[in-house]
Amino acid sequence: MPSGHNDKNANQESVEEAVLKYVGVGLDHQNHDPQLHTKDLENKHSKKQNIVESSSDVDVNNNDDSNRNEDNNDDSENISALNANESSSNVDHANSNEQHNAVMDWYLRQTAHNQQDDEDDENNNNTDNGNDSNNHFSQSDIVVDDDDDKNKKDAGVGVDDDHQSMAMAAVAAAYTLSKNNNNNNSIANDSNSRKRQHDNGNNHENSQKKRKNNNDDDDRQIGNVDPELTTLGDADDNDTNNDVIDRDQLVHKAIIDADSITQHPDFQQYLNTAADTDDNEKLKHIKDHLMRTHGLNHQNKNHNDDTDDLSNSTKQYSELQKDSMLDSSLNKSRNYMEVLPKVISQDTQPHQQKSPSHDNEAGSVDNSEISQLLQSAATKASSLVSLSSSSATPSTSRSNNSKAFDKAEDAALERFINEYEAIERLTRQQVCERIWSSDRPKDNFWNNIYKVLPYRSSSSIYKHMRRKYHIFEQRGKWTAEEEQELAKLCAEKEGQWAEIGKTLGRMPEDCRDRWRNYVKCGTNRASNRWSVEEEELLKKVISDMLEEAQQQQSQLHPNLLEEEQHLLQDDQNDHRNNDEDDDDTASAAAAAAAAIQEQQQLLQQKQQDDDDAIAAAAAAASSSLGDNKDEDKPHDSLGIQLDDNSQNSMVPAPSATSTHSKSLSNTIRRHNNKLRKSLMGNGKLDFKDIINWTIVSERMGGTRSRIQCRYKWNKLVKREAIAKIQTVKDDDMLWIFEKLRDLGITEDSQVDWDELAALKPGMKLNGLELKLCYERMKKKVKGYKQKSINEISKELVDYFSSNISMKTEN
């Protein structure tokens, strides 16, 4: 670096070197190839020696003085130009554009001047060589020398042109960048300009001293040196000094500020991709290992051996590089999602069987591992219900309790569905299609869902999942057109709800409920307030159905109970009389089996008779409805007259009488079969098994739909229960809330009120009445809406305990 550089430029020396590598060190009119440059210098030196030995005395003082004067003039012009440039920048910092234009003009002018000097030197050399050729050496030697010099100069000019072009590009870049930094660097430019002037003066003095020393050396050999070569050294020195100054200026102009580099997008991208350097370091270590393994020493082996070894090493290195990249990609992708089967196509049925060779190399798991993951997901989801119920862990035995699903149960099912989506790599739509699919792939999907809520029946979970995760676009309000289409379909396919739902694009359960709750009754369905007569009729219908169920129970179970008593008596006799033969027990068992078989035959015969009677009654009811038709007005499928305003609301079905009779007969038959199964099972009658609200609606004359009858009955029962619980004693209330407290449950929906009522038969309260007691008494607790049932029960226990204590004291 020149001595005149300031501290800031010295600190940026590494950056300058980087710029010099880009711009080119050949700004001093030298070739890029250092070997070629050295060889040219040796040739010139040998030619000088030959010319000195063969030349005669030639007077070259005048030429030398003239060349020196030209060099001095060039230096003066350079210094004056720089001083003028710096002085203009010191006068007005705001005029930055003129300063840079002056630098560009000076650089172009200096370049043109240097080219002109090179052409003049070439012409002078050609003239002098022609004059001296007759006295010192032959014409052929001169031609050879001239050709060599010309080729070298041509090569040098080509290289210089390239370097000058690159330098001009660098100056242009610095020129553009410096426009943005003029205001921030004005003070620094003032100090730099003063130092540069001082450095230029020192450089000029050093160049004069150097030329003087060279002149002294040349004077000692002046008598033996060719006149053409007397100024060769001076010209080289002058060009070197000028090029050093020019290069320093270009380097300073082309250096990018450090702040600009850090804010450059490419530099930020380099920082963001720093993680990729780890792989490059690994590859570098592999390459170094190969170099050490194969002993590639280029200094001790010839070129052929080096080429062969290097080619072999390159092949092995490329192979190891591929292996390394493959291993790294596999390691990165070997996560939880990659080891699972791929997502199936949208066009195919969800969860098709995977082939055994499916992505074995990528680390996919087989069916056994998938099954383990699903079981683990079911266990985790089931734990949510256990945690939400605090100390009360749900029973693992399944029950037929049809209470509503609470938030904890829905959260557990949702947790399993999310895990299932991740394991099988399916979308939510594909999972819903899987739930509604009629196929049953061997993936234990439903079995694992049932494990999430082990205390609920499989049918209740199945229905709840299909309601919650449906695949239908429409749910909710029905339009008049949809109801008309539903009426047409039900007239043809009543009971085939899957096909009807598929046609309408709705859930089968929605179609079924809409038909029997609203559309089936048509305009005959009343929507006004229930009258007293309607309430009494509803009570009579339900009372008759309960009485019929009790009659069936009395006909079936007395014989069965009698046979069971005989069997128990036989067992007791066996224990008392150990000496009796086992034949007596066998004969008693055989007799009991024969009696049961005979009873079953009687039941089958009675069932057939009942079915025939029901069919006859339905036909008679249909015929009576048909006889009362008014031919002047349209009728619905039940034979009910329609007003003129309601003709468009219902579509008459063909063969209405036969369709209604068949539907009613099938409904009654299914109800009786269900009731008999309950009686044959445990001998107990459940209200939900006895009462079929469709039959209730039919016995009400079709004036109220099944859902209206059910809602009205629940209100009537609740009204009577509220009147009954008014007489419940504090001791019974204390017992109720102590049991609720001991259960440790947190949600109202987790209580089985019927089982709770069975724990104390003497209290004579059913499950509904116990629930009403709780709902009535919890309002006495302050902030009961924000408290759990367990917290409410604790406070009510304290409340009734204090009441009982006060009554006892009084």
Curated annotation (Swiss-Prot):
Biased composition (Low complexity): 51-64, 124-135, 180-191, 586-606
Region of interest: Disordered: 1-80, 114-161, 180-243, 294-313, 346-365, 572-667
GO biological process assignments: positive regulation of transcription by RNA polymerase II; regulation of DNA-templated transcription; regulation of transcription by RNA polymerase II; termination of RNA polymerase II transcription; transcriptional start site selection at RNA polymerase II promoter
InterPro entries (alphabetical): DMTF1_DNA-bind_reg, Homeodomain-like_sf, Myb_dom, REB1_MybAD, SANT/Myb
PROSITE patterns: HTH_MYB (PS51294), MYB_LIKE (PS50090)
Biased composition regions of type Basic and acidic residues, renumbered to the chain: 1-10, 29-44, 149-161, 198-208, 627-636
Phosphoserine found at: 355
Repeat keyword on record: yes
Keywords: DNA-binding, Isopeptide bond, Nucleus, Phosphoprotein, Repeat, Transcription, Transcription regulation, Ubl conjugation
Gene Ontology annotations for the cellular component aspect, listed alphabetically: chromatin; nucleoplasm; nucleus
Chain positions of cross-link Glycyl lysine isopeptide (Lys-Gly) (interchain with G-Cter in SUMO): 807
Record GO terms (molecular function): DNA-binding transcription activator activity, RNA polymerase II-specific; DNA-binding transcription factor activity; RNA polymerase II cis-regulatory region sequence-specific DNA binding; sequence-specific DNA binding; transcription cis-regulatory region binding
Boundaries of every Myb-like domain copy: 692-717
Biased composition (Polar residues): 346-355, 643-667
DNA-binding span(s): 497-519
Location of this chain's protein in the cell: Nucleus
Sequence ranges assigned to domain HTH myb-type in this UniProt record: 470-523
Function: DNA-binding protein that recognizes sites within both the enhancer and the promoter of rRNA transcription, as well as upstream of many genes transcribed by RNA polymerase II. It is essential for cell growth. May stimulate or inhibit transcription. Specifically recognizes the sequence 5'-CCGGGTA-3' or 5'-CGGGTRR-3' (where R is any purine). A member of the general regulatory factors (GRFs) which act as genome partitioners. Acts as a chromatin insulator which are known as STARs (Subtelomeric anti-silencing region).
UniProt cross-references to PANTHER family, sorted A to Z: CYCLIN-D-BINDING MYB-LIKE TRANSCRIPTION FACTOR 1 (PTHR46380:SF2)
Remarks, miscellaneous: Present with 7510 molecules/cell in log phase SD medium.
Protein name per the record: DNA-binding protein REB1
Species classification: Eukaryota, Fungi, Dikarya, Ascomycota, Saccharomycotina
